[in-house]
Amino acid sequence: MGQAVAAYLHFLSIFVLFALLVLEHRLFKLPLDLERARSLVRIDIAYGLAAGVVLLTGLARVVWYGKGLDYYLHNSMFHAKMGLFALIALFSGFPTFVFLNWRNALKAGRVPEVSPGKAKAVIMVIRLELLLVLLLPLFAVLMARGYGVMGN
């Protein structure tokens, strides 16, 4: 039963993560208004929490369920998937820092100022994250089918 719950929570958190990223992409456009700016901050926090749940449930599946830790540690698709997840996490830092820099303006009830160049960069990073998140299931499927097993 634990394996099913861990798998369900893992998949659900991935769907939530993707939905939040799509929502971020949809809401981030100039000119910003106060309500959308506040929503973007909240959505980004939820996105970070969803990423944490993805990571924790994924680790639970690797350590306690699935094919055993040894299988995953000796599978290049697993390493590619983890590397891709880490890369997505690094990219997500840019929009997060932009949103965190809005705190003072939002506390003062002001709309944050965002240059067109910075807005374009944030949008491009979010689009890149969306693309990379779509590659994660490819590595998962290949790994589950036995591709990438290193040495015997």
Task: List the predicted regions and their residue ranges.
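Polytopic transmembrane helical bundles with strong interfacial aromatic enrichment
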Residues: 1-152
